[in-house]
């Protein structure tokens, strides 16, 4: 038995076929793989990505910290809640890992979110925490939250039907 996302019981109730993915019990399919593939390519589909590491970053040096840590420029995140794909660099400019940074929203103007791969969790967090020591920032891992990726050409409409604003 592996690690479980907050949505694990829902996957079981929906009769998902579960597999080990990096130590996590994750759904690989519910019905036909081909039908699910076509649904996402032609319409929409949802994926539990809660096994990925969700970090919240706050503090007066949050932007400076991210600028030091990443190859990409977080100043490019001009709209609230927008995401930026980047790589995290070591002290010599080599790539440690890739990740996604989300800009703060009007509701939480000082809160940045960073999504890190689950397979490199320990290494990435150790590096991020070591770098944070030189900045006035706080890194908080949020294992209590679920993350769902909604993908496909009709994904925006589906999300808008559930969430009323700023999507």
Segment roles from a protein language model:
Residues 1-167:
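Basic, glycine/lysine-rich polyanion-binding surfaces/domains
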